[in-house]
Amino acid sequence: FLDFENDLNVSRTEFGLAIGIQMFLWGLTAPLFGLLADKFGGNKAVFLGFLVFGLGIFLLYNGPNTGIYFQLSLGLLVGTALGATAMSVPVSEVGKHFSNEKRTLATGIVTASASVGYFITPLFTKYSLIEFGWQNTLVYYLYFIVIGLIASIFLIPVKKSSSQDIQIDKNQTFIAAIKEAFTHKGYVLLVCGFFVCGFQIALVATHIPAY
């Protein structure tokens, strides 16, 4: 992303700050979008996420995109959108369609597919930046976002029969759900694992290319 530094006068520090805001909001908004998915349906939560994603990328491409606006588009909006469009909500929604016996396999396939995407996307982005520039690369991202936006419309709502073996407390509040989650050892270890992921993978992806 050295093109940002040259064309938008965005320093590496400002770019790193935007990615930091993005990662923070990704983690912060994922439970909120999960709440929306439980209340109103996963298709609506993912659709909203792609709308915010598209707005962030469009502003980065064609709107005010320097200074604080760079943090707003790449940091605030894209980070918020990732809370709905990354793995958490889709994995949860897919899992609701399967019984306990098949749920692990189904969610594993979704997670593995997302991991392949995480591997391919940086390679595609790097190639596109070199060959076509950052503006065209953002346009390509907008195309993918539109595809995701359309696909989210056809996300099938969960039928009661598909999730009948999932114990759900309809009266449980959001705060109570968070407290319950942190009493589960596996959940705590998973959260710690994502902290490690952020410190090494996000750090490498953000700063190493400059060198």
Map each language-model feature to its residues.
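Residue-level signature of mid-helix packing/kink "hotspots" within the transmembrane helices
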Residues: 23-31, 118-119
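Hydrophobic core of transmembrane alpha-helices in multi-pass small-molecule transporters
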Residues: 67-85, 195
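Helix-loop-helix hairpin linking two adjacent transmembrane segments in secondary transporters
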Residues: 110-157
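Extracytoplasmic gate region of multi-pass secondary transporters
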Residues: 1, 185-211
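Intracellular juxtamembrane helix-capping segments at the cytosolic ends
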Residues: 84-98
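C-terminal ends and interior cores of transmembrane alpha-helices
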Residues: 51-65
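Flexible cytoplasmic inter-helical loops of multi-pass small-molecule transporters
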Residues: 157-176
